[in-house]
């Protein structure tokens, strides 16, 4: 029978000490490898290590940090202080307004609106002021402000309209100011969107929690899809997949599925939950017939040209200009800015000349995706490039290889609210996307986000806006000639999901955007003002509005 060789015999058979030392090292490595390969975690570790190397440059969400928490740095502390300061300012502007009965809240029917200092003749360029006195359902004058109002003047026959500026005196009275931009008969509209008591309730409910939306993540377990709960925060002691951006203090979580690596996250979807942070009494304020009720009773005027030849020559529209309120008006269905001179870009030749050798990055929600749907209808040489993927939320690319035009739309990252399944494989936050843009004089970035943030506490939106601002500042350090444009939110339809998607939330976010980006050399496309002027009450405005937005964009970059 053959005798087995022992390690001692093997060592003695080696010619010298160096050979014996090398043999021992190889033996130790072999033993370690055997132990590791028989352990239950080796497969997950290898997948994790391999994915970390391959995918790190593509997506921040492929960095799975088992134990690392978001740590404070001087930059993150400064950002959190800025978030807190903005939140405190907003809390002061929207104080609690408890109420006993619905009858004690603001009534559009009982409130009055009268023209302040009425004139016999109104001329183009004049200001029209309307004094609004808020009253409750008993006809008693309100002693505090805070009502959410939407003001507009319009002339249907001329397809003309513009928004009004509301000044709240915080005592139940409001001054609503309009600029008379066109001649002819003009009608007035002031809608009570929500009474101050409803505004207070929406603000409290918004900042109370994250439970109004349920996220579901789809992971790949081998070749089979498996589902689990996800969210911006999860109240559980179970093991979590943590998708953390440590620099920007952004976080998203999913419940860890047994045996499924966190890197196997492929898709996401969401739905509205049954959770509400409103009381039964507060919910009565948001029945459809209580929202967007007209205050004005048949107010109209006639505006004359008055031989007005004092129009000042306006500067050409350019990035960095301060946009007033209102930012412009519609006339014959076309948007006209109030503060700068526009080129019309009606001829396809002019549009092509503007876009030639341009790299255009559209970063944001589906209201920006409308741009990439509209452009090929006008510029026939722009063709879709199949970047694979499926569904409306995949990255869209348009190319004109002859004129060297590149246009890309990519959705923003969490939170993204939709019941349609969307891919997470190349998902990224806007600040990280900006960091990857080289930038030059032929590069333009358009950013728009907000609609998907409305269901969540306002600090989520504030933090994202600050992170976007910081990324733009970094971009300007390396490529100051790059053009950056911010498209604000637009108004949307009124539906039963007021607690989640009310335009009140959007109006607050618009104020925040203007505050955070006020000192940056960026262009502003005031989609809010445009959609009020057009009275486009749809989350996805019609093509006439999209055309006006793109027209403003072309004025900024050319």
Curated annotation (Swiss-Prot):
Whichever gene encodes this chain, its name is: Nxpe2
The UniProt entry lists the main location of this chain as: membrane
GO cellular component terms, alphabetically, are: membrane
Membrane keyword on record = yes
| Organism for this UniProt entry | Mus musculus (Mouse)
Q: Which UniProt keywords apply?
A: Membrane, Transmembrane, Transmembrane helix
Its domain of life reads Eukaryota
Q: Name one Pfam family in it.
A: NXPE4_C
The entry's protein name is NXPE family member 2
The answer to whether the entry has keyword Lipid biosynthesis is: no
Annotated compartments: Membrane
Q: Which InterPro entries match?
A: Ig-like_fold (IPR013783), Ig_E-set (IPR014756), NXPE4_C (IPR057106), NXPH/NXPE (IPR026845)
């Amino acid at each position: 029978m053959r005798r087995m060789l022992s390690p001692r015999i093997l060592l003695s058979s080696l010619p010298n000490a160096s050979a014996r030392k090398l043999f021992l090292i190889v033996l130790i490595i072999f033993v370690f490898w055997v132990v590791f390969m028989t352990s239950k975690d080796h497969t997950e570790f290898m997948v994790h290590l391999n994915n970390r190397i391959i995918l790190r440059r593509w997506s921040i969400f492929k960095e799975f940090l088992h134990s690392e928490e978001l740590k404070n740095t001087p930059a993150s502390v400064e950002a959190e202080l800025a978030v807190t300061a903005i939140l405190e300012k907003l809390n002061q502007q929207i104080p609690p307004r408890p109420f006993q009965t619905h009858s004690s809240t603001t009534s559009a029917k009982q409130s009055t609106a009268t023209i302040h200092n009425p004139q016999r003749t109104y001329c183009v360029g004049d200001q029209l002021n309307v004094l609004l006195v808020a009253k409750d359902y008993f006809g008693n004058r309100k002693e505090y402000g805070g009502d959410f109002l939407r003001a507009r003047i319009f002339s249907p026959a001329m397809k003309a309209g513009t928004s009004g500026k509301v000044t709240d005196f915080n005592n139940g009275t409001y001054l609503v100011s309009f600029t008379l931009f066109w001649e002819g008969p003009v009608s007035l509209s002031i809608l009570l969107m929500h009474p101050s008591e409803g505004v207070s309730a929406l603000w409290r409910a918004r900042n109370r929690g994250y439970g109004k939306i349920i996220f579901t993540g789809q992971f790949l377990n081998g070749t089979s899809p498996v589902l689990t709960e996800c969210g911006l925060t999860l109240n559980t002691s179970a093991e979590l997949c943590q998708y953390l951006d440590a620099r920007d203090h952004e976080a998203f979580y999913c419940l860890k599925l047994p045996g499924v690596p966190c890197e196997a996250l492929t898709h996401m979807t969401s739905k509205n939950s049954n959770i509400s942070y409103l009381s039964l009494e507060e919910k009565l304020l948001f029945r459809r017939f209580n929202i967007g009720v007209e205050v004005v009773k048949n107010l109209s005027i006639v505006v004359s040209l008055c031989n007005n030849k004092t129009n000042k020559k306006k500067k050409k529209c350019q990035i960095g200009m301060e946009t007033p309120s209102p930012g412009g008006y519609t006339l014959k269905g076309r948007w006209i800015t109030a503060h700068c001179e526009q080129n019309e870009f009606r001829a396809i030749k002019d549009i092509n000349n503007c876009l030639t050798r341009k790299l255009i990055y559209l970063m944001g929600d589906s209201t920006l995706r409308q741009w990439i749907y509209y452009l090929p209808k006008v510029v026939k040489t722009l063709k879709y490039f199949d970047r694979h993927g499926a569904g409306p939320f995949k990255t869209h690319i348009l190319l004109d290889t002859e004129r060297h035009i590149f246009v890309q739309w990519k959705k923003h990252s969490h939170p993204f609210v939709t019941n349609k399944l969307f891919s997470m494989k190349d998902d990224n936050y806007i600040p990280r996307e900006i960091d990857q843009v080289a930038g030059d004089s032929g590069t333009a970035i358009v950013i728009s986000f907000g609609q998907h943030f409305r269901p969540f506490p306002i600090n989520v939106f504030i933090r994202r806006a600050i992170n976007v601002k910081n990324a733009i500042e970094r971009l300007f350090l390396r490529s100051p000639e790059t053009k950056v444009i911010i498209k604000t939110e637009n108004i949307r339809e009124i539906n039963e999901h007021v607690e989640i998607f009310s335009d009140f939330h959007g109006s607050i976010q618009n104020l925040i955007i203007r505050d955070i980006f006020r000192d940056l050399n960026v262009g502003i496309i005031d989609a809010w003002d445009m959609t009020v002027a057009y009275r486009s009450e749809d989350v996805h405005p019609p093509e006439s509005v999209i055309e006006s937005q793109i027209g403003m964009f072309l004025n900024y970059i050319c």
